[in-house]
Amino acid sequence: MTSEEFPSFTVGPEAIEHFNVNGWLLTEPLEGSQVALLQSWIDEIELWDDNGEWLHYRESTVHGPRLCRTENFVPFHDALGSFLTTGVLLDTASALLGEPAVLYKEKINYKAAGGGGYAPHQDAPAYRFIETHVSCMIAIDDSLVSNGCLEVVSAAHREVLDMDETGCITDELVASFKWAPVEVLAGQALWFHSRTPHRSGANTSPVSRRAIYPTYNAASEGDLRERYYEQKLAEFADAGDTGSRVSLIGDFQGVMIE
């Protein structure tokens, strides 16, 4: 269940103020049959092969190789693309940014049983071209402490924090923060600022814990989605990476399969 520390909000003045103060917001954009439909779309994408223009990433687990992430799927799945670029999600992103929003990037994290977690980090250092973004984690399956739910730090999103050589938050700062786990039920969405510190543990449960993570920027700064993916792949190529990373920072703690 959602704890009292993380109440769910309807997006309005109170919710926007909560986001501005704390750097996160829990909402409920889906219900009932909508959740089942979204789950079926993710099931479809999981079955895509590795030869398309979308980006699949795989990790090694104690249960064998598993898909850990898919990116750049919006152009190839009309229904999911529409869900992420119109309607309640875009409206919420616009409200939190204070102006019309546009999709910047999207990913699905599958977090299979035995799948790796993510080290404490902020998203902003991995995002190019613009200063402020807002992301959300839409739970496809219940995201619980037992399967590696997100943990956040409230009211710590005013600046980019000191980082180590991997681009993650330094151990000294990590130890100084109060980290709070946020359990997010299927169909709920946890919104967070691009500078909100967050992390997640490995999935020690016997089942996957999937989530979609769309990120939005202010439309006034441009539609930069294609440029983001071009830049990401170029930076991977320049660094000689052939599937050894999922991010432009070193936050993923799983064992990648190249």
Describe every region a protein language model picked out.
Residues M1-V21, L26-P120, A126-Y127, L233, ...:
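Non-heme Fe(II)-dependent double-stranded beta-helix
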Residues T2, Q39-S40, W48, G52-L55, ...:
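Non-heme Fe(II)/2-oxoglutarate
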Residues E17, S143-G201, E221, L233-G240:
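Double-stranded beta-helix
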Residues K107, Q122, I138-D142, S154, ...:
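Short, structured patches in soluble enzyme cores that scaffold and shape functional sites
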Residues Y118-Q122, I138, I169-S176:
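Active-site glycine-rich loop that binds ribose-phosphate moieties when present
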Residues H121-H133, F177-K178, V184, V207:
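A short beta-loop-beta micro-motif enriched in histidine and acidic residues
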Residues R128-V145, T215-A219:
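Short, conserved beta-strand element in jelly-roll/cupin
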